[in-house]
Amino acid sequence: MATPDEDEDEDGIPGLPPNTPFYMTPEGHRAMRDELHALWSVERPKVVEVVSWAAGLGDRSENADYQYGKKRLREIDRRVRFLRKRLDRAEVVDPATQTRRDQVFFGATVTFVHEDDREVTVTIVGAEEADAGQGRISWLSPVARALLGKRVGDVVRLRKPGGAEEVEVLRIAYP
């Protein structure tokens, strides 16, 4: 049974079957490992030190340093569990090794044009790496799923809340 301190859905990606692959680029995997290392080896020891110091002051019920420190430790431990589980399940896919560069696959940078001649460039990455503001979309997103397997010149139908729209694939690039 999960305690209130645990994420109930730490293992899976919400809304997907439990055995869905957890693809990541090498850069995303490295960033996740770096975050885990920083939390476990740098931040957590500092917080433990503050909590130990605060616990030595006596009454813990009104000790803000102690209470905040314990809360922060729970947050760190939750994130560490999450990162470890993700890293254990990660399937690192290096887009630079893609041999079929004429089609859209994981890791591709795709430029497409909307019906109003507006060009958009996106890179298809892992779910944890997605950042729409940076043009990095999850391979699980509706746009990426519509683009996967397409070639330059293909017309793709994107379903949007305001209705469907057709876009044409202009360029496909891999690192």
Model-based region annotation:
Residues 93-175:
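Non-DNA-binding regulatory cores of transcription-related proteins
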Residues 40-43, 90-91, 151:
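Conserved NTP-handling cores and scaffolds of large molecular machines
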Residues 77-98:
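Structured, basic alpha/beta domains of bacterial-type, RNA-associated proteins
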Residues 1-81:
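Helix-rich terminal scaffold detector
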Residues 21-34, 72, 79, 85, ...:
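Low-complexity, charged, repeat-rich alpha-helical/coil interaction segments
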